[in-house]
Amino acid sequence: MLESMVPVARADQSKPIKRFVCLSNNYGIYREAFFPEADDVGAGYEIPETLKPLEAHRNDFTVFSNLDHGNTIGHQGVPVLLSGVRPHLASYYQEGNISVDQKIAEYEGANTRFPSMTVRVNESNLVSFTRTGVQVPDIDLRGMFRALFIEDPAEKKATAVEKLKRQNSILDVVMEKAKVVEKDLSKRDQRKFAEYLEAVRSLEKKLELQEPWLDRPKPKTDVSEPQQGKGTEADLRAMVELMALAIQTDSTRAITLSSGFVNGDFGLSGGYHGFSHHGNRADHIDALKKIENNIMRQMAHLIELLKSQEDMINGGTLLDHTTVMFGCGMATGPHSTKNLPLVVAGGGFKHGEHKVYPDPESAHRIPAANLLLSILQNHGVEADRFGTSSGTLADFEWKQA
């Protein structure tokens, strides 16, 4: 690692810092090639075809069966992956439909230049939401590189400072007027107004977090700016390498990635969505296996990168303190949201198993949000509930600090 890329040491060394990375797609998976057999439980299970690229790291990851968010909503399940809450039902939950990465971003605050990074390769990222229900905008491969390593010109920085000052002044006026308006509202309108004020406060907090980083230099790298459009495999590989650099330089501690597919890649003619509605056609199933195997190859590459790098802040490796998750909010192309495909690697969890939970249709079903809560607690976030959780996953443990 270049000296200029070494993260700044923390003043508080009492707890290790943690990171969270999620890889996803918007169309689910071909489940017959993804999940181990239902009775092939625990360590020593036979790794299925789609997960074969992860085999070298089998002691570093866990496969989960029968976890889901308890809904039957097809494509609308995609944005529910990291929250467990459907966006239009957010008002019924204390924290709305905030996603895990954004909850971590709130927890980390201004500890890093980017509280979170939401990125995409050939598919919009639909899984990241703030507590006010705002979907976090995503950036592409080139945008990711420039955000991490390209310094803004002095004039642009000066403009950004002035913009922050103006925005803060406007927010001050808004909050002052709000105090007057609120008194005359009905109870129903007061609830809506409270949501509006929460959004204003959220923006205020975001502005506060930006300011300290405007004058701090970005890390230097000898990596060249990647060229987009070289194909799904090359673009996705370049993106996970940038994600590893983002973790390595402590530029962020929360990243979500959504990956897709471009017609013509892997010698295939068609679209991911069309292939996902395979109707048991052998050629479509073969296409899905190729696309999804590539996602797992790049996840394996990310695991290897994190595993091979020393954690300059905590000691150990970056993988020891980075939870890497793969998941889909829609389980399969035919619109099922039952038994979501979920794999978790690293993060200090005890891995190496296929964990099977009660049938999602049974009265004893375990919410997928329990896994999300475990990830949050592992990260250091103090919470006993998250979204639709009923608790943590009791048998998914991690090494305590």
Identify the residue ranges that each predicted region occupies.
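Ligand-binding pockets and gating/stacking loops
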Residues: 1-401
